[in-house]
A protein has these predicted regions:
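Extracytoplasmic substrate-binding proteins
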Residues: 45-48, 123-180
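Hydrophobic core
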Residues: 12-16
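A short, structured surface patch at a secondary-structure boundary
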Residues: 58-109, 113-118
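Early extracytoplasmic/lumenal segment of secretory-pathway proteins
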Residues: 40-48, 95-107, 123
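A short helix->loop->beta-strand "cap" motif at the edges of active sites that frequently abuts
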Residues: 54, 72, 131-134
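Extracytoplasmic/periplasmic, Sec-exported soluble proteins
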Residues: 55-59, 98-101, 109, 116-120, ...
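Extracytoplasmic/periplasmic mature domains of Sec-exported, cell-envelope-associated bacterial proteins
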Residues: 37-40, 44-47, 75-76, 113-116, ...
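Bacterial Sec-exported substrate-binding components of ABC uptake systems
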Residues: 2-8, 19-62, 161-180
Length: 180
């Protein structure tokens, strides 16, 4: 009887505490409602993508390399005077500078997903949502968060293996530099 109680107590503890730690995986297929993907963004909002996005706009140029790393395509992007831009995205329509997004141009592109920076674009979330546009706001601050966002981009574009590979490649590049 003591063994049974110990096993029962351990199972109960595992059940209770499994939801207490940080969520390493912020996305999941939404099987219960047949959605493509459910994402918890960096604002804590749950965003349900009913199907794989086909018309993505990035409001932060820093995310373009992540999107490019998984072979993702965009229909619009913010412009910036700093940073390298992937060649495939140089001729994509612009929706204004990162800090001055032209919402009319953005909405006119009819995106099914907007990838925004939490700090810069959180104020736009209600307007985008009222226009039935799915939007995630992210803000990776650490190396591990950057890798998590690479993996997220792979999931968004329906190629999770490319997101995992991009994160692994980043690890290899960092390792090569730090071992010198």
């Amino acid at each position: 009887m003591k063994i049974f109680r110990a096993v029962l107590a351990a199972a109960l503890c595992l059940t209770v505490f499994s939801g207490c730690g940080p969520n390493a995986e912020n996305t999941k297929p939404a099987n219960d409602d047949k959605a493509f993907l459910t994402i918890t963004d960096d604002t804590g909002r749950t965003v349900v993508l009913p199907e794989k996005p086909e018309r993505v706009v990035s409001l932060a140029t820093s995310y373009l390399n992540m999107i490019d790393a998984v072979g993702g395509k965009i229909v619009g992007r913010a412009s910036s005077k700093i940073g390298e831009m992937p060649e495939a995205m140089k001729n994509v329509p612009e929706v204004g500078f990162v800090y001055n997004i032209n919402m009319e141009s953005l909405i006119g592109l009819k995106p099914d997903l907007v990838i925004a920076n939490k700090n810069q674009h959180e104020k736009f979330l209600p307007l985008l949502e009222s226009n039935k546009i799915h939007v995630i706001a992210i803000n990776p601050k650490t190396y591990d968060e950057v890798k998590d966002k690479l993996i997220l981009m792979g999931k968004i574009y329906g190629v999770p293996e490319k997101g995992e590979a991009a994160a692994a490649k980043l690890d290899q590049q960092v390792k090569a530099v730090t071992e010198k």
